[in-house]
Amino acid sequence: MDKRLYIATICSSHRELLRRYKLGVELDQFCMAANMTGEGRAAADREISELKEHAQSFILHAPFNELFPAAIDPDARALAMRRFNEAAQIAIECGADKMVVHSGYVPFVYFKEWHLDRSVEFWEEFMADKPEYFMIAIENVLDDEPYMMAEMMSRITNPNIRLCLDAGHALCVSKVPVMEWLEVTAPYLGHLHIHNNDGQNDEHRDLTDGQLDMEAFLDRTAEICRQDTTITLETRGGLKSVEWLAAKGYLSPESIR
């Protein structure tokens, strides 16, 4: 897992962890679109410049507030396309070759067939002019089952469009077991978000603090996921979870600085 593990900048201890371990970084500074311009952008750029000293590589998390790829309003769809294109440009400037995007599915707003059809169209259009090395990973958030995302991927032809399974979101949003999510989405995964919770709330707890058997989950990912599938630790703290990963052998001694 060493070269595939990233630490999210939402983790309060991400700076300390980068000093102690050889990890990649998932940049969350631009989850808020306002940070892509003005003083927000300047502050984010300063922080990213500092992180480059220790980070092994970068993944960028795209903005997601009020951005819906399957939007019914054409102007809303255009806004999503513009913001994601701006985020992709920032990712490339930062040296990130992978960007995480939210699926944008909202229950009771979009019929699933509509969301499915429009999502295929949107993501194919979005990726049409991107560099060959650039990949997106579409993350489940309010998605209540994995089958729609798998069906979407079966229709998508661009190999640089993959899925991001957020285990914590699947645990607290869906009645489908997380391990079933993994089995269904594994052929299409390019990335994973790992954190735990009580099965009801998106709390981003430490890996062992919640309803998901994280050891069983990680062991199964190693068995069925592609070897280039990256993983981001997305807990609020971070330190305790990385120490657990090291103690369990998911991180080798070579990953310690």
Predicted regions and their residues:
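Active-site beta-loop-alpha junctions enriched in small/polar residues
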Residues: 8-12, 28-32, 63-65, 104-106, ...
